[in-house]
Amino acid sequence: MFYLMPLGHVDFLHSGTLWLGLFYVLFPLGFLLYGVNDIVDAEADRLNPRKGTFLFGSLGATEQLAALRWKIAAVQIPFLIVFFVLIGPRILAWFVVLLLAVALYNAPRFGWKSHPPFDVLIQASYLLVFVLSSWLNGAAQLPWQAFVFGAMFAMHSHIFGEVMDIEPDRLSGRRTTATLIGAVRSKLLIAGFLCVETAVVYIFFRGLVITGFLGFGAFWFVLDAALIWKNRPYSPAVMRLFMWGWNAASIVGMFWNWSTGSLTHARHVAGL
């Protein structure tokens, strides 16, 4: 979804560069982000009932994880070369910032993934996808309001993942924002993020459909925290339902953003 946000109304059928970038974001970039995470979290993942499934990620054997880092590096190199040709030297700075964010999040002992609230704040690095998409496709960078929305969206999504992982994270001794403040406060925090996102989208973009979805999400998490699951862990069936719903909403969101370009141009608001 982030890759396509700067590209409202773009011609999908006749842009090889667009598809190249989309492929990179979906596979090699995902391989880097989640592959490194799998290596670092190998022990904790063995305690996580979500892992080892199609929806929630693989559970690699020790020998597979040992070879993974070299495969991750090998997959990045061709894209670094191609992007250098297409974009120029500035792509080197992009990769440096990307690798710095990955290192900050995953570093043993000092990694931000185990140091709240930095485990949440580092998710703003997903905004690098906005930048890459605009560079590759010759599109204008999104307005700052869209960057704020994107950062908060990435952060609330990460907290939700932490809520689903509270029990295995506690068993493994990992500290996260969710293990620190508990499930109920985490859900209310997600609702707070969603309320701010709702305000940003409505005030600056008048995106009524997106505003409605975000507002409903905020209402749902308050309801969940107060009346439904509260502090109880989600069942595997409920987590699968959430994930299928998340994927469906992402697909609809990508189509909507392409058809309307609703987040590419912000309205001027006096005093802001």
Describe each region flagged by the PLM.
Residues 1-272:
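Multi-pass alpha-helical membrane architecture of UbiA-family
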